Every structure is written in C-alpha cells, then in structure tokens.
C-alpha cells in the first residue's frame, strides 16, 4: 500500500527513513530541479575533496564518532581489570535510542489519546480515546491515570474483553477517529510496523510485550484500526490478539495460544497479618524441609487465595536459586503428603477391612473407555519422599512402607492394562465388568486388594463397536485422560490427619503404665482416678494405672492426607485444609476408529439393495431427504442384505463410520412411451402403477359401455324391423332389410336354419354374407378417419411454457429453487437489446438461529468431606451456601473405646456427616449447552455466470443485503419459507444438536437432564437437585453413607437418540460453532438483479440468426442432460449469443455459444418429459424443438436431477395417437348404431 507523507501529522516535510524489511514500492514525489542540481554539486565537491586530501584519513559517519569516543573512555577501566564489565555488553541492546518514523508518528498521536492504566503505582496497560468512547481492555487491572477518566462508569463486555465509557465533552477533541477499512499491508503502532495479512495482525517477535495491552494500531491517516489485547508467539513473528471493526461491527481476532499483555500484578498472600508476594515467602527461604508444620499452617491460611499454588511451589523448593524444571518437580508436592488406611467393603476374603489400597473414586468420563482410579496408596514416591517410578508407598500399620510398582494390578472381569500412574491415581483400560479390584503385592509377598461394585461398559466411539484400534481408519473427536504428570487445573483437597491410636505405645510396668514414644509425638489420656492427659515427645510413666485405662495416639502434623470420607477429620483443626494438583486431566483428542467395508450395492426400480459385511457390530441408518425424514437405524452384527426404498426426494444412507451415501431415483421403465398400446401401458404402470390402473380401468369401462350401447341400439333397431313381418302371415322381408338385420326374406326358415342350409349347401355364400357387415364397417372407419377429428385431444397433463421474466428496464427479478448444486438459468429480455442469460447456482445455504444460552449441564461430583467425630459430646451442623448441601448429626454411632473413631470416653459420641454437589472435573470438556433458539438468519453462497465469468459471492438472504458481481448488484431473499429445523429449545453436545424441551434454569429434576446447572463451564454459580440424602452410618465403621439419584447428564447421553444431523428433514446438514443448518432443500429463493446498461448488447450489434431448424437425434428423459439437440442456422456476422430454453420443463446446459456463418450447434438438455416440445432462443431468434424421449436405463443415481421434476408424467404423443384411434373407432361404431336406430325409428313411426 502507498504511505501518505507524514506532514499529515507534523505539518512539515521531512525525509522518511526507508523501511528495509518490506520491499514495497513507495511513490516518491519528484523534487524541484534546483534541489537536484544542488545535490549533484555537493556530490561533486565531496569527490574532489577525497581526491585532493589523500593524507587525511577517511572520516567515519557521524553516528560512529560517539561510539569511538565511548571506546576511548572505556579503555582505562578495561586496562585496570581483566573482568569485562556488563554496561558495554548491554550497549548494543540499547542502541536504538532514536525512534523510527513509525514510532515517532505514533508517539505524536498517543500524546493526546493514550492514557496509562496503573495499579499500585505500576503501569499495567493503556486506555485509548476512540471516536466518542474511551476503551480499555477488561483484563487490565487498575485505574486510568486521569482524574476525569478514572471516575467514569464503564460498561464491560466479556465477549470482546473490553470496557467502554463515554468520553467527557471537553476531551472529545483529543480522541482519534476509527475506521473499518483495512486493506492488506503495513500499519503503525508504538513499537513500529504491524503487518495485516489474511485477516491477522502480526509483528516481529519481541516488538511487543506484557504491558502493551490497550495500545492502538493506526493507519497512515492516523485512524485507529484495532486495539491490542495480547499476542501469540509463532516463532519469527508474533500474532496479535486485537479488537477491530468490520463495517461498524466490533469483532475480536484471537490467534491460537494468545496471551493477555497486561502487566502481571504480583499476587499477595498473608502470614500473621502481614501480606507478602506469594512467590516470595517471608521466611528466607520458607522451606518445608526445615519447618514442615509451620509451612503447612501457612499454606492452609492461604488456601483460598489466588496465589496459593505459587506459595506452595515456593515453600516446597528450598533453594532460593532458579532450578531447571524436570518431571520430578511434579512429584515434589507429594513429599508434603502421605498414604493412609481407609475402609474397604471387600478386601478379597469376603469381609471388610481398613485397607492400604482403599478405592476412593472411579472416574469413567473419558469416551475412549479409560478409567481414572483414585486409591489410598501413592505410586512413584518412596518412603523417603523421593521420586522413583519403580516404587509405591502404602500405609503399613500407620507407618509408610515401600513396595514394587510391578506388583500393582487392576481387574474387572479380566485383568486391565495399566497405562499411567502417579500419586494416588491410576489410568487403566479394562474390559466389561460389574466390579473393579485394585491390589498390590508388598515386599513380604503379601497381596492386598480392594474390590468395589462398579458397572463398566466401555462407550462406543463412532458407529462401530470395535475392540482394538485399527491401523487405518477415520479420526473422530473423543476425550481421554492425558498421560501427563504436569500440574493441571484439577485438584484434590488434603488436610491434617487425625491422631492415630497405637496400643503398642503402652506397656504395663508393676502397676504403672509406660508410654514409649520412639521419637514421635504422642497424645495420651488415662482415666486413673482423675483426668491425666497431655502431649509428649519423650517417654512418660503414669503411676497407679493400667493399660486398659489409657489411650495413646500418634500425632503427626508434618504431612497432609487426602480428605477422604472413609477417614475422620482432625477434631482440633476443624475445616482447615490444603489443595494439590492432580495428574491426568481430561482432554478432547481424536481417536482412530475403523471404517466398515463398503457394501455391495445393487440398484432396482426405486430401491437400493445393499449387501453388508460387518466385521463387528455396525450401525446402519438412513433417512429420506424430503419433508418427512422417516429416520431408521439398526445394528448389524452378521452378513445381511437390506432393501431400501428410495423416495423421489432422495435417500441418505450411513453405514458405520463411512461418509453418507446419497441416492436419487430415475424414471426408468421396461416399456416405452412411444410403442404399441401394451408397451405404453407397461411404461406408465411401472412409473405410476396406481394412476395407470385407475385410468386404464376407467377407459376400459367407458369403451365397453360404448360398445355395449352400440350393440343395444343395433338389437333395438333389428327388433323394430322384424316385428311387423313376424306379425304378418306369409310376409316377405325386403332383401335390403334382411341383409342389414341378418334375417330371412321369407318366413319359411329362421336365420339359424338359413345359416345351416348355406353351410351345408353353399359355403362360399355363407362366408360372403358374414364378411359383408365387417367390410362395410372397415370402409366406414377409413372414410371417417379422413374427415376432421370428431373429438379434441384429451391432454392428461398440460405443461405450461412459462419461460423467463421479461423486463423493460435493467432491473430483473427471478425465483430459483432452494436446491444446492443445481444450476438455474434466467433470461433477461430488454427491448432494443440482445437477450442476456444469467446462470446461478446455490453452492450453500445456511440457516443460523439467534441463540441465548440458558445454562450448561454436565456430570456432577458428590463432595463428601471426612466426617467429624465429636468424642464425648454432640456436634452441630452449620449452614453453608453450597449446591445441594446436606448435613446431619448422628448419635449412638460409635461404642466406648472403639479405636476406629479415635474416641476414648464412656459418654455419647456423635458423627457429623455433610455432603454437597459440584461440577465434575470433566465439565470443562464434557458438557451440554441448553439454548433458546430465535429467528434464524439465512445466508447463501451463490455462483453467478455473468458476462462469461464465474463469480462466487455470499449474501444474506433477507431481501435487503446487496452484493456486487462485477458491475451488477444482486439482492437475495427473503426466502419463501420461514422454516427452520430448530425448535424453540435446543441442546448442543459437542458437534451434535438436539431438539429438546429441557427444564428451565433453577427447575432441574433429579436423575434427568439439567439436574446440575451452571451458566458457563467456568462459572462458579451452580444449581443442583440430585436428591442427595445422608444416611445413618453403620456402627463401628467410619464412613458417610448417602443416597442420590444417578447423573441425569450421563443418563441423557445413553438415551438421547439420534441428533438432528441424522433426523432433520429436507436433507439438512447440521453443524456447530456456530449452530447452523446448511443446504436445506425447502422453499424458493427470490433474487433481484440490477444490471447496468453497459452490460447489454444492442440488437444492431448482436448477430442475427436465420433459417433455424432443430433436430433431436437422441433423448433420455429424467436423466442428467440426457438429450442432444442440433440446431442449424445461418448468421449475418460472427459473435456470441445467449442460449436459453423458453420452457421451464427443459434445462439447457450451455449458456452462451459462439456463432459464425452457416453452421450448426449442438446443445445438451435435460427434461422429465417423455414427449418434450420446447422453444430454444438463440440471441433474439427462437426455434421449435420436439423430442421423443426414452426412459433411462439406470434406476438409481448419486446426484439430484438438473431439471424441473414433474409431480406426474406427461402423456406422450404416441399414446395420445392410440387414444385417438381407439376412441375414434369405438365412437364410429356407436355413431353408426345410433344412425341405424334413428332411421329404423323414423320408418317405424312413419308407418303408424
């Protein structure tokens, strides 16, 4: 692009420095001639000086003199010491002190419209005055460093990450203008040039940094084109995340991996009412190894602060120096935790126990079938808190012990494959089963295991139930637990373990009790006549007491333990807790799935016969692409042959994970519409059996009725003639009457007797008498055929020749069917100009509804903290604002001196159980969104053949939005049908959309869709209704039993059925991001076209065709351009002519041809008519074409028809000819019989 001189901003001229990285040709204005001559004179003087002053050394450029002086000044310190100083080394980095042209230009503008945003005295970003608004990135914390702007009320938009407010009136003159014009090229910002290409802004890597958020990007006229929010490092260049404008509509461009460029604000933590940066604890250094208990207390005090994990990392790293990170650092947090013993319902021998490998949680959200199991032991860590892949540590009688990881096993109905381990977590792929067992073998070769009831049925990915990943196939989206040990967003709660009872610490010594601590901290209590309790770290003797009267427990507050519902919490510390990250996060990935063998397909009349060969259970589904989809599906497990009927609108069949197959029927038939009557009847019977039977039956009935009527009239006339002679004795019948009525002239013998006589005596006369009436009838029929037609031809179907719209001006309106992939031609006839043909084809049509998100729902997680056991007293519940929170106190649970409850008193012991619901960790990837769908907006991608060029444009089909094709303006829509496949309520799950009447927000029902609701996957507002009821724990067991409805989300996933992608009518293709329906073949699409005068060719300039004739040598109807027509012509001059069919039942492939001399042209056409008669217009001349089309041989094709599909087939000319002959012959017989009857009646009446 061309740069405008910078005098626009400075009101003065100066020579800009060339921009070397971009080889853009700049338009340099010529200077006045005197300046050019002065420059040449200066060059000449310089050259003479160089030649004459040889003794003087050549001078270096001025900018290097300073460097030379600096080097001379630095020689002294460099000679005094051998160590190189750092300031000279940093000089090259600070070399660019003078800003370049672009930087100076931006600084001049920024002085007025840019303001710093400060937080605690530090600049975190910038605010910009643009138009009538002051704009600041929403992620930039702090206030604007301006008294007037700081007190404004900003409106926040999280979608665009922007805050806006109205500019005070007295500051509007300082604001910059903005523009949506962004031609590709280079723009300017504070750090130099910004390249805009492919819809993205990029800069050289290193030119921007955190703290630049909010800086504007200017064009060369000083207008703001975008505001910087952040950047994504892409190697040599950095892609900018910006907010920009597109035709007054704000848009946000965010490249993948973009980070916000606000200056980081140090997160503060608290210690003894003193705040400090979380990454720098005040104890120098605050090391867990040195002060473990105090460090954990500090972490518990700051567990809810944003910088908790920074404090945790700093507290566990003793060295103040920066260390190289490794995979071992991810295990570093486990040195502050320990394994534990917990209750297990089945320890492998049919009874419960306190197991070192107790199962806490089994997660199966991954769609690839991987299980994530949480246990009480820790894997990958030794008892010395070091990282070791080959070991695991478990609690052996309250003391951590090591075991080999090789002895770890997981099984359901068969052994599982362990794919990953770290800390408390195991990843495994397991076969189907109803129970899950985890166990290990310790160093003493003793096996420990724990079994839980768990129904495991690996989900199906795709549409085939396969057992192992194929080598080749198809990639489908799925989710899995990533085998990464790095810190994730998922976390678990830990807390201080309770005191652990240990009777081995007590021993009886001659009436006294000795407590041996063995280097540990022990809490004791003895009831020996009085209360005797305390906390000791050395051995102690209790006088006059017995072991049964004392209780001793080991106290260890130097390590955390998982907050398990199977272990009581520490009574002294209450709700104090910590958090640690856990490995193996759930993530969306792609999985390789097999593709079923292609079926063997045989085509029949309006049907497809598919022979299927499934290697494993494979899903077959199909739907009609008409208004009623009639979706059907079935799982095929063995070789099977299926016969599917193909409707007129088409059939879509999906077999396994293959792409859908689409079929359309053709009007194929065994007979022909141009043969004998029986062939014609067979032809129409195969096409329209019901109507053909009805028509043939009615016609047969009418013909038979007419024949019967003629026979009846003849019999009536004969009787009228015979009666007078029969009543007269000896009467003789006239010869003519006896000949017509087939009676004897005399009454001596009957007709039968005469016939027998002639047969016996004169057989030639018998045959002559029999042939005379037949010969007379044939002669009369042939004579009447030469007469004018007695009856008009009965047209069974009238095909209207509508043609194209004719306009008197350059504005043209047409309506095309909303069918993708079928070209449509329209003819523009303008008086005085040669006709113009426009060809249009819909490449895609999109219906995008306006959505408003009600909530998202996902699988819930039941959080059960460790139960609180109140020894010798009663606990009380407190109200907590948590989703579906429940709290109960149970009395009479634990007996006197029961060790599991850690109580030692003879009074009542109580347990406080509490539970609540929160979103599962999988909700970030596995969730369904409930939307309300409103009016859908339609857009069409249109291919237009205009003036010999194919041009593709995209327009909103609203009847208002105009797009330009060269010099013509097209306005598309509005569509004739406001139909949309989406209901008022829809649910979106990954790439699928479902019409569903979901419950509103805050009204979810247990066990159904929406039992847990949240506004967004990240929001903290959660509503839950899971029917959570706490139950009374069994005596002698530490646990929190409860009853709860199953997850409504998981139930919905199993029962949701087919999505709209498979069940939508009219062949709609449903897509998401955004939600839209594409290529729905419903309704029509009106198009208004404004064509300028220059696009037309005057009649005098266009070729004129004469002597045109049309011949159709071959035609196959209902086939894709199966007809060929040859048009002969004579033309006055060479040129191009538009070709168009004036009948909408015939579609011509060619739109424009070149004519020259006396020649002929060949065109291809498509029609659904058996007898096609149409007119073809070439330039301004029309010619009549007639074709006798035969049915296609192919029953089924994989493309839609390119012509207008008729609801009922036409009657061929041959069929109409046979109808005329048959009806004419029968009508003649009736007419002759009627004439005879009339004559006989007249004669009869005249006698009387």
Curated annotation (Swiss-Prot):
GO terms for cellular component: host cell cytoplasm; host cell nucleus; host cell plasma membrane; membrane; T=4 icosahedral viral capsid; virion membrane. Residues 22-44, 73-85 have a biased composition (Low complexity). Residues 351-354, 387-389, 509-512, 541-547 are annotated as: Interaction with host Mxra8 receptor. The chain crosses the membrane at residues 693-713, 764-784, 796-816, 1225-1245. GO terms for biological process: fusion of virus membrane with host endosome membrane; proteolysis; symbiont entry into host cell; symbiont-mediated suppression of host toll-like receptor signaling pathway; viral translational frameshifting; virion attachment to host cell. A lipid is attached at residue 1242 (S-stearoyl cysteine). Residues 714-748, 785-795, 1246-1248 are cytoplasmic. It catalyses: Autocatalytic release of the core protein from the N-terminus of the togavirus structural polyprotein by hydrolysis of a -Trp-|-Ser- bond. Disulfide bonds join 113-128, 269-278, 283-287, 286-318, 344-450, 347-353, 416-430, 478-591, 526-550, 528-545, 721-742, 858-923, 871-903, 872-905, 877-887, 1068-1080, 1110-1185, 1115-1189, 1137-1179. The keyword Glycoprotein applies. A lipid is attached at residues 721, 741-742, 1242 (S-palmitoyl cysteine). Belongs to the Old World alphaviruses that usually cause fever, maculopapular rash, arthralgia and myalgia. Belongs to the alphavirus structural polyprotein family. This is Structural polyprotein. It comes from Chikungunya virus (strain S27-African prototype). The lineage of its organism: Viruses, Riboviria, Orthornavirae, Kitrinoviricota, Alsuviricetes.
């Amino acid at each position: 692009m061309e740069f405008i001189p910078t005098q626009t901003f400075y009101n003065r001229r100066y020579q800009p420095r060339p921009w070397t990285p971009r080889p853009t040709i700049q338009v340099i204005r010529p200077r006045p001639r005197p300046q050019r001559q002065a420059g040449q004179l200066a060059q000449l003087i310089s050259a003479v000086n160089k030649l004459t002053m040889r003794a003087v050394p050549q001078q270096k450029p001025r900018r290097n003199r300073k460097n030379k002086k600096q080097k001379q000044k630095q020689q002294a310190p460099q000679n005094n010491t051998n160590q190189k100083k750092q300031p000279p080394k940093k000089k090259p980095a600070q070399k660019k002190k003078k800003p370049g042209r672009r930087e100076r230009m931006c600084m001049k503008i920024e002085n007025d419209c840019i303001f710093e945003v400060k937080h605690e005295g530090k600049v975190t970003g910038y605010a910009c005055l643009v138009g009538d608004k002051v704009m600041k990135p929403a992620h930039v914390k702090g206030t604007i460093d301006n008294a007037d702007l700081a007190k404004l009320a900003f409106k926040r938009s999280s979608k665009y990450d922007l805050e806006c407010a109205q500019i005070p009136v007295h500051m509007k003159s300082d604001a910059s203008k903005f523009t949506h014009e962004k031609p590709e090229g280079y723009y300017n910002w504070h750090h130099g040039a910004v390249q805009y290409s492919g819809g993205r802004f990029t800069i050289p890597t290193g030119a921007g940094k955190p703290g630049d958020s909010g800086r504007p990007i200017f064009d060369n006229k000083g207008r703001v084109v975008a505001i910087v929010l952040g950047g994504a490092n892409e190697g040599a260049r950095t892609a900018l995340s910006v907010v920009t404008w597109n035709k007054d509509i704000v848009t946000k461009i965010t490249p993948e991996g973009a980070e916000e460029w606000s200056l980081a604000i140090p997160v503060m933590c608290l210690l003894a009412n003193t705040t400090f940066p979380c990454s720098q604890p005040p104890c120098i250094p605050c090391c867990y190894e040195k002060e473990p208990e105090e460090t954990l207390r500090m972490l518990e005090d700051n567990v809810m602060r944003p910088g908790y994990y920074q404090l945790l990392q700093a507290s566990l790293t003793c060295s103040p120096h920066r260390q190289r990170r490794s995979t071992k650092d991810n295990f570093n947090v486990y040195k502050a935790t320990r394994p534990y013993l917990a209750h297990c319902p089945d320890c492998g021998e049919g009874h419960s126990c306190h197991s070192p490998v107790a199962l806490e949680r089994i997660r199966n959200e991954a769609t690839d079938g991987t299980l994530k199991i949480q246990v009480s032991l820790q894997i990958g860590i030794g008892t010395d808190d070091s990282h070791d892949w080959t070991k695991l540590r478990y609690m052996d009688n309250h003391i951590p012990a090591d075991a080999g990881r090789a002895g770890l096993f997981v099984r359901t109905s068969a052994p599982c494959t362990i794919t990953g381990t770290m800390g408390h977590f195991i990843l495994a792929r397991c076969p189907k089963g109803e129970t899950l067992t985890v166990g290990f073998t310790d160093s003493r070769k003793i096996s420990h295991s724990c079994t839980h009831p768990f129904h495991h049925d690996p989900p199906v990915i795709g549409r085939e139930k396969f057992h192992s990943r194929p080598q080749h196939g198809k990639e489908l989206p799925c989710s899995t637990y990533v085998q990464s040990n790095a810190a994730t967003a998922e976390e678990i709660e830990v807390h201080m373990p309770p005191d652990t009872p240990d009777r081995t610490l007590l021993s009886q010594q001659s009436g006294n009790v000795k407590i041996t601590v063995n280097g540990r901290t022990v809490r004791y209590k003895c009831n020996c006549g009085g209360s005797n309790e305390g906390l000791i770290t050395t051995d102690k003797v209790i006088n006059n007491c017995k072991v049964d009267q004392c209780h001793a427990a080991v106290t260890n507050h130097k390590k955390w333990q998982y907050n398990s519902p199977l272990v009581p919490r520490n009574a002294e510390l209450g709700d104090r807790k910590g958090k640690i990250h856990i490995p193996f996060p759930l993530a969306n990935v792609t999985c390789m799935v097999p593709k079923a063998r292609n079926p063997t397909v045989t085509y029949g009349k309006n049907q497809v016969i598919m022979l299927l060969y499934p290697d494993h259970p494979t899903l077959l589904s199909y739907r009609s692409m008409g208004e009623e989809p009639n979706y059907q599906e079935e799982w095929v497990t063995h070789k099977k042959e299926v016969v599917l009927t193909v409707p007129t609108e088409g059939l879509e069949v999906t077999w396994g994970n293959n792409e859908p197959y689409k079929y359309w029927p053709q009007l194929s038939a065994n007979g022909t519409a141009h043969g004998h009557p029986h062939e014609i009847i067979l032809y129409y019977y195969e096409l329209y059996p019901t109507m053909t039977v009805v028509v043939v039956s009615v016609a047969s009935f009418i013909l038979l009725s007419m024949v019967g009527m003629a026979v009846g009239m003849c019999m009536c006339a004969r009787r009228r003639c015979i009666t007078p002679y029969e009543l007269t004795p000896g009467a003789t019948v006239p010869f003519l009457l006896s000949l017509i009525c087939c009676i004897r002239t005399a009454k001596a013998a009957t007709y039968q007797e005469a016939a027998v006589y002639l047969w016996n005596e004169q057989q030639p006369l018998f045959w002559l008498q029999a042939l005379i009436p037949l010969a007379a009838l044939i002669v009369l029929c042939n004579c009447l055929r030469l007469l004018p037609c007695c009856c008009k031809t009965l047209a069974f179907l009238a095909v209207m020749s509508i043609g194209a719209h004719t306009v008197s001006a350059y504005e043209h309106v047409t309506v095309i069917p909303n069918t993708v992939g079928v070209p449509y031609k329209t003819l523009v006839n303008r008086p005085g100009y040669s006709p113009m043909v426009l060809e249009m084809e819909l490449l895609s049509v999109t219906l995008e509804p306006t959505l408003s998100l009600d909530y998202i729902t996902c699988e819930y997680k039941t959080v059960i903290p460790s139960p609180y056991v109140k020894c010798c007293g009663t606990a009380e519940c407190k109200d907590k604002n948590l989703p579906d929170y429940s709290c109960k106190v149970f009395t009479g649970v634990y007996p006197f001196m029961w060790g599991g409850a850690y109580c030692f008193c003879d009074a009542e012991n109580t347990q406080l159980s509490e539970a609540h619901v929160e979103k599962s960790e999988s909700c970030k990837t596995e969730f369904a969104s409930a939307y309300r769908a409103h009016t859908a907006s339609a857009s069409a991608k249109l291919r237009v053949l205009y003036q010999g060029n194919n041009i593709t444009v995209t327009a909103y089909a609203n009847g208002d939005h105009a797009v330009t094709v060269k010099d013509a303006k097209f306005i598309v829509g509005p569509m004739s049908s406001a139909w949309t496949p989406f209901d008022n309520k829809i649910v979106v799950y990954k790439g699928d959309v479902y019409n569903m009447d979901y419950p509103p927000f805050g009204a979810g029902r247990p066990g159904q869709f929406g039992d847990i609701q949240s506004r967004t996957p990240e929001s903290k507002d959660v509503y839950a209704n899971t029917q959570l009821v706490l139950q009374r724990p069994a005596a002698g067991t530490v646990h929190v039993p409860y009853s709860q409805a199953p997850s409504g989300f998981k139930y919905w996933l199993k029962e949701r059925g087919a999505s709209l992608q498979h069940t939508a009518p009219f062949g709609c293709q449903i897509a998401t991001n955004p939600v839209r329906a594409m290529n729905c073949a419903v309704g029509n699409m009106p198009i208004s076209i404004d064509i300028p005068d220059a696009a037309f060719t005057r009649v005098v300039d266009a070729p004129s065709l004469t002597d045109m004739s049309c011949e159709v040598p071959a035609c196959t109807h209902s086939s894709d351009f199966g007809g060929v027509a040859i048009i002969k012509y004579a033309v006055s001059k060479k040129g191009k002519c538009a070709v168009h069919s004036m009948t909408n039942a015939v579609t011509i492939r060619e739109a424009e041809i070149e004519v020259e001399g006396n020649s002929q042209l060949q065109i291809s056409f498509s029609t659904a008519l058996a007898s096609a008669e149409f007119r073809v217009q070439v330039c301004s001349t029309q010619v009549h074409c007639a074709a006798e089309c035969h049915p296609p041989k192919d029953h089924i094709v994989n493309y839609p028809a390119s012509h207008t599909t008729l609801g009922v087939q036409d009657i061929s000319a041959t069929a109409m000819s046979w109808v005329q002959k048959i009806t004419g012959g029968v009508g003649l017989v009736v007419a002759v019989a009627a004439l005879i009857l009339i004559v006989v009646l007249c004669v009869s009446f005249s006698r009387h």
